[in-house]
């Protein structure tokens, strides 16, 4: 199959603003050839399942050639694929299969650093005067850039590591085996764009750009969010927009919202509108830990406060929000006091901690409480931004805290109650990671096959909620208004989208307490409208002048559409 033959979806420039994303680890999703490692052929086999679930876009973490000392984020070749997970032709077939089902695909692209096994680094360390001599950041001293924090405090004592071959120190913001690229070198910039073009030419729908705040280093700064970094990222955006329209750039910048907004590159036009020439999307990291804090404290204020602190983003841009992913539940963007609280509540065993976070999946974090899992998912699907689900969370998969680093949340997808969870026909010892054997979360009780047969399962509930969300553009495009309310244990907000056929108004009411709670809401601006519950289509009493009273079960929630009654007094659905 040639690149020109690759299937590309139709033009829809802002598709990502209403999309539901799904992160899938290729090596853990499906092994079709009994090799013990999932591959692109296996992932292609399961595209019908992902289409059925309602996924709009797959996010695929790194699958490039790599020593795999950091789950593939240690890249050894930006245009090569790990042999055990397939070939370029296999990737083509997977990409076309996804597009044929209306599913887009973005992949991780690690700009900041490479593996120390990358040929660029090997050439740089062995030939300082050669063409790759200044592809990385080298120094005769380890005293430079002392204001830059060490990110992996558990394992790295410094951001500098001595290289015996070159006789100099090299700079790394992450693990010592991941040397940072030198973006002051124009050849490095060009090499990054060439590697991106390699994948975009195949019809890829975009990239999640990993660790973007750290591209440049400057004395007297913390080496994060520097002007030079923003200029480089704007160059990337221009390159993509000019050559590959309708593709998306999703930035990973684990920063405060006021800093992250700058990664959209907000610029004001003459007509007063604000556009973003840098990223299309950026993750809103601080929301995620505050959802966990709010529910455990039974108080809306952690969520309300961070939403109030979130600036408006440029037109045509979008947040990405998530509950869990392939990394630890990061606690960088909380206070020391809140971090200790989160560790005390959600990581009672020291093995559950990793760096500045918690390495657990969603279901174990919530003690496998179905009501809590559903509430968290409802918040994910209704708060501002495009939601990103993590593979296996739709069935309540567990984790394995006995595995090293973040591998405990990257175990094989549990499809059947058979040996190896329907992931592989290999002997168990050949699997790249062991399956979950836990009596609560083990594959005998938690698997896709069993939940498909049960209409009341978490899987069917998650699918139903995804499809409801996809029917209402207000969830992705609408404004957000926190309604407050009489009860601090209840978080209520309105998502509103103006339209030619009338405004689409969605009212979301969430009980963060484990006990039933009443709440009175000021809905006078919607007087006369009839709340229609979106899951069952049940109309509630019309909104009047008085505070609107609702009672919610423990960890319960409502999604309403506030409809205009027709001439018969019935709600307009």
Swiss-Prot record:
Stated role: Catalyzes the reversible interconversion of maltose and alpha,alpha-trehalose by transglucosylation.
SMART domains named in the record: Aamy
Active site (UniProt): 210, 252
Domain of life from the UniProt record: Bacteria
Gene name linked to the record: treS
SUPFAM superfamilies registered for this protein in UniProt: (Trans)glycosidases, Glycosyl hydrolase domain
InterPro entries xref list: Glyco_hydro_13_cat_dom, Glyco_hydro_b, Glycoside_hydrolase_SF, Malt_amylase-like_C, O16G_dom_2, TreS/a-amylase_N
Organism: Pimelobacter sp. (strain R48)
Organism classification: Bacteria, Bacillati, Actinomycetota, Actinomycetes, Propionibacteriales
Residues annotated to bind substrate: 70, 113, 178, 208, 326-327
Entry annotated with the keyword Metal-binding: yes
One of the GO biological process terms: carbohydrate metabolic process
Keyword Metal-binding: yes
GO molecular function, one term: metal ion binding
Reactions that this protein is recorded to catalyse: D-maltose = alpha,alpha-trehalose
UniProt KW keywords: Calcium, Isomerase, Metal-binding
Protein name: Trehalose synthase
Family membership: Belongs to the glycosyl hydrolase 13 family. TreS subfamily.
Binding site for Ca(2+): 112, 180, 214-215, 217
EC number(s) from the headed UniProt entry: 5.4.99.16
Pfam families given in the database record: Alpha-amylase, Malt_amylase_C
